[in-house]
């Protein structure tokens, strides 16, 4: 037998081949997951376990929040705490309100050291205490030597050797013992004893300034005359000598860290109960505690009853009540006066009629016959 020729199928028409190809391509594109396989990883496809692009963005935000709060990004006493679905760096500082000012390395004055640490945590910046007491502006015309520490307007001037000299002290770099030198001469002042905030008596106010300059600490005049046993040093705060410069106290209690400047401050905790019937306030200018007494009380500690309260002009809140009471009283008085006037006018007429009837009843028969 001879070799058989291979079986050949009849050639398909060209139109049929094109039709089959187009159907296969259309079927391939319509298969589920085909579009996802064509898109790059991480592209705008559906998130695993999610419901769309919105869930993708939320997931990314959550992951970014978790990555942000860690030991490297939440420092200076901050604690990572849950805030909704993410984590947040929280600065939990319970600061007291006592006025013990400190100067920060950023040039800002803070009410006390706790407020400084809270500001460092809030801004995540390294803020340290450069000096005890408020920051002072350098108003002198010095030579400009030395570095300016901090960016604030009231920054300390850091000298090359001495450090910050305060209370009118000058840096003497040529001296053997480099330090702050006080050139205050009190020889021309007369004897005028005063009591200072450190509990010591000085012959005149100039010696108080000299002692403050030498000790490089704030010493203020409390009152004229020598100190007595009743003087309490703890009642005093610290302020600048001569009140030529009032520092700006940074309070991190609100979002803007507004500057706390004012002539009155809340009294410290050791003065609780200082005012019996009133509010205790610490006056910055005099560095003394005072009482704002309630209505009806007077005295240094609001312990006395004010008997002249009826003659005191009422406050705005009570003025409306006083006016209403006055109007009601005036109306009542007017009604009473009207009633009294009506009664007094009717009474004489009634009396006259009664008298006439009584006179007619007294006539006898003889008098009546005579009249006839």
Swiss-Prot record:
Main subcellular location of this protein, as a coarse class: membrane
Segments forming domain Kazal-like: 90-137, 181-229
UniProt subunit comment: May interact with ST14.
Disruption phenotype annotation: Mice display increased susceptibility to herpes simplex virus 1 (HHV-1) infection in the brain but not in the periphery.
Residue segments, region Disordered: 139-161, 351-372
Protein family according to the UniProt entry: Belongs to the tomoregulin family.
Name of this protein: Tomoregulin-1
Organism: Mus musculus (Mouse)
Composition-biased stretches (Polar residues): 358-372
Gene Ontology cellular-component annotations: plasma membrane
Annotated Pfam families: Kazal_2 (PF07648)
């Amino acid at each position: 037998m001879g070799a058989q020729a291979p079986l050949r199928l009849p050639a398909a028409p060209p139109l049929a081949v094109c039709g089959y190809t187009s159907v296969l391509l259309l079927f391939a594109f319509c298969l589920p997951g085909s579009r996802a396989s064509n898109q790059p990883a991480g592209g705008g496809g559906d998130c695993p376990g999610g419901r769309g692009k919105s869930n993708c963005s939320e997931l990314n935000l959550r992951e970014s929040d978790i990555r942000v709060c860690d030991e490297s990004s939440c420092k200076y006493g901050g604690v990572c705490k849950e805030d909704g679905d993410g984590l947040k760096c929280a600065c939990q500082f319970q600061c007291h309100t006592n006025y013990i000012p400190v100067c920060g390395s950023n040039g800002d004055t803070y009410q006390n050291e706790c407020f400084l640490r809270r500001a460092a945590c809030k801004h995540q910046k390294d803020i340290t205490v450069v000096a005890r007491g408020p920051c002072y502006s350098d108003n002198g015309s010095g030579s400009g030597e030395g570095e300016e520490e901090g960016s604030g307007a009231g920054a300390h001037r850091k000298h090359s050797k001495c450090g910050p000299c305060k209370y009118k002290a000058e840096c003497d770099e040529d001296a053997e013992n480099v330090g702050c030198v006080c050139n205050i001469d009190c020889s021309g002042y007369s004897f005028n004893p005063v009591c200072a905030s450190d509990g010591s008596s000085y012959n005149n106010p100039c010696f108080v300034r000299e002692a403050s300059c030498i000790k490089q600490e704030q010493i203020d005049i409390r009152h004229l005359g020598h100190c007595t046993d009743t003087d309490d040093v703890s009642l005093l705060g610290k302020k600048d000598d001569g009140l030529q410069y009032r520092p700006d106290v940074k309070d991190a209690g609100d979002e803007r860290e507004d500057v706390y400047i004012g002539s009155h401050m809340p009294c410290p905790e050791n003065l609780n109960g200082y005012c019996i019937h009133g509010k205790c306030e610490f006056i910055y200018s005099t560095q003394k505690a005072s009482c704002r007494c309630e209505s009806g009380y007077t005295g240094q500690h609001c312990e006395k009853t004010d008997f002249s309260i009826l003659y005191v002009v009422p406050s705005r809140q009570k003025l409306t009540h006083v006016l209403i009471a006055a109007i009601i009283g005036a109306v009542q008085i007017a009604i009473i006066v009207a009633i009294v006037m009506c009664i007094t006018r009717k009474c004489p007429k009634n009396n006259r009629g009664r008298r006439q009837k009584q006179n007619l009843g007294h006539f006898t028969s003889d008098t009546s016959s005579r009249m006839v």
